[in-house]
Amino acid sequence: MKFVCPLIVVRDMEVSRAFYEEVLGQKVGYDLGENVSFEGGFAIHLRSHFADLIGVDEDDILRGPKNAELYFEEDDLDAFLERLNGMDSVKYVHGVVEQPWGQRAVRLYDPDMHIIEVGEPMESVVRRFLARGFSVEETARRTSMPEEFVRQCA
């Protein structure tokens, strides 16, 4: 068996597709009308159609349960954050935070209240610590990454 992708349910395909394309820079792989797959490896599916497929009432499909997130990485997190600041429609779970392992991330909601996390790649985190003068060993401890990974990032 092969896992293909996560699929999230959306109320308005046009609004959600615009969010993923314009806010998160995702590219559409396939547009099948009620289902849109993105090259990033996830899909959105129209709620009314999904409810019919699984045989439930639309109202039985939860909105914003806060029990999962889609995770993205952005090489230039600061530029992304600056771009977000100009978008009044973006609703935040929280602003940028530094996780205990040193990674900076922001969480926001998509139009259907799915949680979206955008963080910097761990390679960037490691390089930032090394640039601050941390040793390979200190960086590995601080980031919880193996020393070999830290050396490869140097």
PLM ranges: what are they?
Residues 1-5, 26-75, 81-109, 121-132, ...:
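Vicinal oxygen chelate
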Residues 2-8, 15-19:
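Long, low-complexity interaction regions most often at the N-terminus
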Residues 10-13, 100:
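Conserved beta-strand-loop-alpha-helix junction that forms the acyl-donor binding cleft
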Residues 12-13, 75-77:
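Helix N-cap motif at beta-to-alpha junctions
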Residues 16-21, 84, 113:
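Conserved active-site tyrosine of GNAT-family acetyltransferases
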Residues 116-117:
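Long, amphipathic alpha-helical segments that form or neighbor coiled-coils/leucine zippers used
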Residues 147-154:
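Major-groove recognition helix of helix-turn-helix-like DNA-binding domains
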